[in-house]
């Protein structure tokens, strides 16, 4: 994961209370950067399950322009590495965003929806679990609900209640698999 994932540990006790979950989020990383460290972080660490949450920093063009298909392909490559090593994969939807305050020229709403559609179809075709954070956290404008799940000065990163909602969605999906 990226900053959203990294900050989960700062805004919640979820990882302390669930020590089988390891947070590997690194601030501002994009899927290509995550892919570079994926084998070491997931396979060599001996994981039996991986939860992939990625894409918003590419949509924000943090490392330059990239197509939605390229973003998805990087996530698919991580999924394939895990599957090839008998690691169960969960792919998460990208959280809603209708503004990227650090790159105001980007209009993310449609791109988030499109990427989520591609990810969901991939999961269905490949028998991979899809964690749909988007549906539970989106507002009328296609953004992350503010002030419920993000601050009005951010609009991209979850607040404490946002992380609580993510935990609820995640644990409900995991319980379905048990």
Predicted regions and their residues:
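Short C-terminal domain-edge/linker segments immediately following a structured domain
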Residues: 27-33, 51-57, 81-85, 120-123, ...
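Active-site segments of SGNH/GDSL-like serine hydrolases
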Residues: 53-59, 79-113
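Catalytic His-Asp segment of secreted/periplasmic serine-dependent ester chemistry enzymes
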Residues: 95-178
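Alpha-helical scaffolding segments of alpha/beta enzyme cores, especially the outer helices
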Residues: 70-80, 84, 114-121
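Structural recognition of the beta-strand scaffold that forms the well-ordered cores
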Residues: 21-25, 49-53, 89-93, 129-132, ...
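Sec-exported extracytoplasmic/periplasmic mature domains
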Residues: 39, 43, 55, 80-87, ...
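Short, functional N-terminal and low-complexity linear motifs
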Residues: 1-6, 44-47, 82, 86-89, ...
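Conserved SGNH/GDSL esterase-like catalytic core that processes O-acyl groups on lipids
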Residues: 1-77
């Amino acid at each position: 994961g990226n900053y959203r994932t990294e900050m989960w540990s700062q805004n919640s006790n979820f990882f302390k209370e669930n020590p089988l979950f390891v947070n590997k989020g690194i601030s501002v990383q994009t899927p290509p950067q995550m892919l570079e460290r994926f084998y070491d972080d997931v396979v060599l660490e001996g994981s039996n399950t991986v939860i992939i949450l990625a894409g918003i920093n590419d949509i924000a063009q943090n490392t330059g322009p990239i197509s939605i298909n390229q973003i998805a392909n990087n996530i698919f490559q991580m999924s394939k590495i895990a599957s090839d090593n008998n690691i169960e994969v969960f792919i998460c939807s990208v959280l809603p965003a209708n503004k990227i305050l650090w790159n105001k020229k980007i209009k993310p709403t449609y791109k988030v929806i499109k990427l989520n559609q591609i990810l969901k179809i991939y999961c269905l075709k490949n028998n991979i679990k899809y964690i749909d954070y988007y549906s539970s956290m989106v507002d009328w404008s296609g953004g992350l609900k503010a002030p419920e799940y993000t601050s009005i000065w951010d609009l991209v990163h979850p607040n404490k209640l946002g992380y609580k909602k993510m935990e609820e969605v995640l644990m409900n999906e995991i319980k379905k698999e048990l």
